[in-house]
């Protein structure tokens, strides 16, 4: 499958196993992937590299996925990058905060390639105007 072959996703998660699983799933869908092990590193990559999508864990050291989202949405150049937050539990408070800050969607860990693909299709079609 290569419907996302010209797209780059940054995966920000402090657990290398989670990054690897998400990366493998994204590559299976055709994405090129970059990785960050914390929020500060993610922001550095975002400021230096063009990405089409950010998938960030809600809970990370230095800067959480929520803080990265807030920083991106406050930046005139970066504000349109689609952001999917990942979390272990779908707590209403966290989801509401993410929505208030402008997250595009969320995934609850663990998730499979089918669920990831479903969320990606929705986000990419809605936010980037590309029908898949």
Pin down the residues of each PLM region.
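C-terminal output helix
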Residues: 111-120
